């Protein structure tokens, strides 16, 4: 086999690979003879079909099957011999004739080689959130609202009321698609409608009609409506007032708590603290990763981005429960491209840093992180044992420990400032970020 490096520019490289004719023809001949012993053909007994007949009828097909098997073997050896770190490959067949060498080009995308410097340029705003009894009481109040019962009342609409409405949305005086609905239930203050919509209903009474003006958010998913000033003609058809359950032993049992109200309140606070810790870690880590992407200079392999896009599509399908009749491949790649590119770039940068630094995950550190994570489950010890039996899960935990160490290492060199934030705003932002990332 002869290998010629045709061009190598950046992360792109082409290998012209030539396989001797006798090597190809020998394998093809053996496959034809093997096929002749098993194939059925009119006029011949099984195993007695002449090889020449098989070659005449199936020779081209057999040759292509042989080549399809042989090409990956040849380019894999060439890549190994040339010591190339390949991210993606496309094969272009050049010459394929009996009695002549097989020639093909392997167009490669290589993993970029780069060094990350300038960590002091990274700016991180570290969120500081104080979790007090006020936030705990508000969380319990939110839980009470989840179990609220509603009864119809004859009064003006107030916050937390459930209203049944008809509405027609208009832009520039014309009704827009998706802006009209009848008999829609809205809980005032829940944030299920765009900002300003629910506030505009407060004070209305049953049977009343009103036109309100609201502006769609700049980041609204429908670009035709993003940032647009619109009007909504609203008719209130029913008003229901919420009746919240008392926080007593019966109520806390709904959440699997057996120790009464005091235990319930303590568990709520512990859960809030645990969730807050991981969210704040994520917020800081996201800023660190963003900063790393800004200072690192390299070309991102498109094949890795495409692979990540395909994985995101499959993940979306899983989230939809494998919806029948829904082909995720029909979704445009650009819907997933930005997130996919970020993930690939972050992964490449972290790998580059880890190759130059020695970050290790000690067994005790992995165990400590596992203990912390399983506290969010109903049966922590049982969950812990299940995870420890799963090699993939344990490998992910080990990787997370190393990732946390790397993040701390970068933070020691970065410009870090603090910013006080509200607990519920942090939770809301986290939910929005998760939704935006599918």
UniProtKB/Swiss-Prot annotation:
Subcellular compartments: Cytoplasm
Cited SUPFAM superfamilies: FKBP-like (SSF54534), Triger factor/SurA peptide-binding domain-like (SSF109998), Trigger factor ribosome-binding domain (SSF102735)
Phylogenetic lineage: Bacteria, Pseudomonadati, Pseudomonadota, Gammaproteobacteria, Thiotrichales
PPIase FKBP-type domain span: 160-245
Keyword Chaperone: yes
Catalytic activity: [protein]-peptidylproline (omega=180) = [protein]-peptidylproline (omega=0)
Record gene name: tig
Name the UniProt record assigns to this protein: Trigger factor
Family from the record: Belongs to the FKBP-type PPIase family. Tig subfamily.
Domain notes: Consists of 3 domains; the N-terminus binds the ribosome, the middle domain has PPIase activity, while the C-terminus has intrinsic chaperone activity on its own.
Gene Ontology CC annotations of this record: cytoplasm
Source domain of life: Bacteria
GO molecular function terms listed in the Swiss-Prot or TrEMBL record: peptidyl-prolyl cis-trans isomerase activity; protein folding chaperone; ribosome binding
InterPro entries membership: PPIase_dom_sf, PPIase_FKBP_dom, Trig_fac, Trigger_fac_C, Trigger_fac_C_sf, Trigger_fac_ribosome-bd_bac, Trigger_fac_ribosome-bd_sf, Trigger_fact/SurA_dom_sf
Purpose: Involved in protein export. Acts as a chaperone by maintaining the newly synthesized protein in an open conformation. Functions as a peptidyl-prolyl cis-trans isomerase.
Keywords, sorted A to Z: Cell cycle, Cell division, Chaperone, Cytoplasm, Isomerase, Rotamase
EC number: 5.2.1.8
Gene Ontology annotations of biological process type: 'de novo' cotranslational protein folding; cell division; chaperone-mediated protein folding; protein transport; protein unfolding
Enzyme class: isomerase
